[in-house]
């Protein structure tokens, strides 16, 4: 799906890591939400409150997921899941466009 229809968008941006990671929140009619964002090259650690599905639309990164010491290479067209109340690290090597779905 290349677009979302009949949604609300929160005007205020979510800005993290001195502006190197930004996103906008999209709210669907059923109350579910996603964020659409961009990550610039760099290393970042994120903490989750709820489980997340991270879909990488374009770009490249390595990800260290909870319970795994080894990084996994992720590129545009791929996705990964993170459990609730967890922490994960990303090393973004090319500007990355992403969708984060809260599960």
Curated annotation (Swiss-Prot):
Superkingdom of origin: Bacteria
The entry's keywords: Glycosyltransferase, Transferase
Enzyme Commission number(s) of this protein: 2.4.2.1, 2.4.2.2
CDD domains per record: cupin_PpnP-like (cd20296)
Reaction(s) the record says it catalyses: a purine D-ribonucleoside + phosphate = a purine nucleobase + alpha-D-ribose 1-phosphate; adenosine + phosphate = alpha-D-ribose 1-phosphate + adenine; cytidine + phosphate = cytosine + alpha-D-ribose 1-phosphate; guanosine + phosphate = alpha-D-ribose 1-phosphate + guanine
Top-level enzyme category: transferase
GO molecular function, one term: purine-nucleoside phosphorylase activity
GO annotation, cellular component aspect: cytosol
InterPro entries reported for this sequence: Ppnp, RmlC-like_jellyroll, RmlC_Cupin_sf
Functional description taken from the UniProt entry: Catalyzes the phosphorolysis of diverse nucleosides, yielding D-ribose 1-phosphate and the respective free bases. Can use uridine, adenosine, guanosine, cytidine, thymidine, inosine and xanthosine as substrates. Also catalyzes the reverse reactions.
UniProt cross-references to PANTHER family, sorted A to Z: PYRIMIDINE/PURINE NUCLEOSIDE PHOSPHORYLASE, PYRIMIDINE_PURINE NUCLEOSIDE PHOSPHORYLASE
UniProt record similarity statement: Belongs to the nucleoside phosphorylase PpnP family.
Protein name as annotated: Pyrimidine/purine nucleoside phosphorylase
Organism phylogeny: Bacteria, Pseudomonadati, Thermodesulfobacteriota, Desulfuromonadia, Geobacterales
Gene (name only): ppnP
